[in-house]
């Protein structure tokens, strides 16, 4: 989990170097960066909510740095209530359950299908 586990500061310090290393070893491989999930726990823990907000802002800023450096084949998916808004998408307020993963798939699939130029069996 390269976005939810490090601090915003660590994301700022490490993301560009990580992507540049990956790009050096795999120059043509698409790199997809996805912001971290907005978690239910943030409804009750303002510190956690603010941390997720800062993590997502930090990775968005680093994606812009990478784009300005001319990194090609780099894609960014912004958090879009991936788990839904009915409080049913996690097992514990943090980790997705089956419903949460299904919702994430439905949000990610169109972008991934377009980026990788693939069709999923159910399309």
Segments predicted by a language model, with ranges:
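Alpha-helical cap/lid subdomain in secreted, periplasmic
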Residues: 1-123
């Amino acid at each position: 989990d390269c976005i939810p586990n490090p601090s915003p500061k660590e994301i700022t310090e490490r993301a560009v170097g990580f992507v540049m290393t990956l790009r050096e070893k795999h120059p043509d491989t698409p790199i997809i960066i996805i912001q971290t999930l907005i978690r239910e726990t943030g409804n009750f823990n303002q510190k956690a909510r603010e941390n997720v907000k800062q993590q997502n802002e930090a990775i968005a800023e680093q994606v812009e740095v990478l784009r300005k450096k001319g990194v090609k084949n780099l894609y960014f998916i912004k958090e879009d209530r991936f788990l839904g808004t009915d409080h049913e998408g996690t097992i514990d307020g943090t980790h997705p359950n089956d419903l949460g993963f299904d919702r994430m798939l439905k949000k990610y699939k169109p972008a991934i299908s377009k980026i990788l130029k693939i069709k999923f069996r159910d399309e």
